[in-house]
């Protein structure tokens, strides 16, 4: 927007002809893009505004249900890049000595493509977040946050005789929501349809069969690790695009567990809500000045 009128005046295409890309991460003077079935490194070395370097670092990830594809690459506290989703597979790459089998869990990579390995826990939609201590939180459609077990995958798998039921646990004991928008008419119609309503109740419970009031599309959690916004430090935010709000909660350590609780004075409100049913926050990030940036997928319907 060169004249500040709120309308795009010029568009530059830096890279194209990629598979559907569900996240990018800066690395090695370029970016790493996750676009199933590949993880691709892109860079512009001659400064002409186009990425002439394109290297497939890893290949072999499944291309299936959209919300299960690998997504949200970000640097971890250990200088690996963490990526969630992907549904596993036998992964190959030009810088790997041998193919690596990745189960249906999250994983981490070296940015030069020399290593890839599973990590504990996985998200059920999009996104995950770290706190200052390196604890990782993932998310599902029906809860604002899930704590990943503190034991790394590489330790759990050293003993093949140990049976681990799950490497993650629900950190929140609630799933109710308080949007300010009215549900879209299609959601109300779906809830009153006897066939569809029964299908959703039988398969997912009542939370998925009523127009709103419960998490159904929680995604993109973010623990605010800056101090520029008073009162938000170390709290967790999460998007709920289907109900047009951003959720906020605090993280409490209770013994060896980390639990998510609504703030005492915010028990029946959300951090950010809109009455505009086209407002669909889908991603959160912290800017260099400490502000929270929100990606709004502004369209009429989110089908969840």
What are the roles of these predicted feature ranges?
Residues 1-304:
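Beta-propeller domains with acidic blade repeats across secreted/periplasmic ectodomains
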